[in-house]
Regions:
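Signal-transmission linkers at sensory-effector interfaces
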Residues: 127-157, 165
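Amphipathic alpha-helical "output/dimerization" segments
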Residues: 105-126
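Active-site-proximal structural scaffolding
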Residues: 1, 26, 114, 143, ...
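GAF sensory/regulatory domain recognition
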Residues: 2-59
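Intrinsically disordered or highly flexible coil/loop and linker segments, enriched in small
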Residues: 42, 46, 123-134, 163, ...
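Short regulatory alpha-helical segment in sensory/regulatory domains of signaling proteins that mediates
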Residues: 1, 5, 154-162, 167-177
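Glycine- and acidic
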Residues: 99-107, 150-156
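Helix-to-coil/beta transition segments that act as allosteric "coupling" elements at the rims
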Residues: 56-98, 106
Length: 177
């Protein structure tokens, strides 16, 4: 499974399997990733892409050329693993990207579940973005408050020796940030 978040010119993907989670990596808008992106932009809810035989081999050869993912796949082979002879990718779309479910057999009974997971993930990711925005606003408010304390000290300066007090306030405010 993976989730893929759209960026301006490429996307960021987080992938996990029975072997664990890989670090996030960038996916270019090329080949299969372009097809996934375009389907999402057209408003698809679920795209199913089947790879068998030579097409599956070519798919994994391409994935091996990508930074991070390629390294992990090559390590899997070096550790005695192998690529599947066939797989079915299910891209379930949400506002910010898609969830990718990979199966080895058709699973039409799971299609509605994949779509439901995408909707819940959209809610979760929206909450994540809201929290990021709130944290940034809080940080900006802290910076503004610190600047105001330094300004207040500067405005209270009556003689040149008071510059030392301002420098102390500045130091303390920077430490707090």
């Amino acid at each position: 499974c993976a989730f893929n978040i759209y960026g301006e010119n490429e996307s960021t993907e987080w992938f996990s399997s029975e072997m664990g989670t890989m670090p996030r990596y960038k996916t270019p808008r090329k080949k299969i990733f372009l097809r996934y992106y375009e389907a999402g932009q057209k408003g698809e809810l679920l795209l199913i892409e089947e790879f068998t035989g030579k097409a599956c081999v070519a798919h994994y050869e391409y994935l091996c050329t990508l930074p991070v993912m390629g390294k992990a796949l090559k390590q899997m082979i070096a550790d005695g693993g192998s690529f599947p002879e066939q797989q079915i990718d299910h891209a379930a779309y949400f506002k910010y990207g898609y969830l990718l479910f990979i199966t080895l057999e058709p699973c039409p009974q799971a299609h509605d579940i994949f779509k439901r997971f995408a909707k819940v993930f959209e809610q979760t990711f929206t909450r994540f973005l809201d929290l990021q925005k709130s944290e940034a606003q809080t940080r900006e408010a802290q910076i503004e408050a610190s600047l105001e304390r330094v300004r207040t000290q500067a405005m209270a300066m009556h003689k040149s020796d008071d510059l030392l007090n301002i420098s102390k306030v500045l130091y303390e405010e920077l430490k707090m940030l």
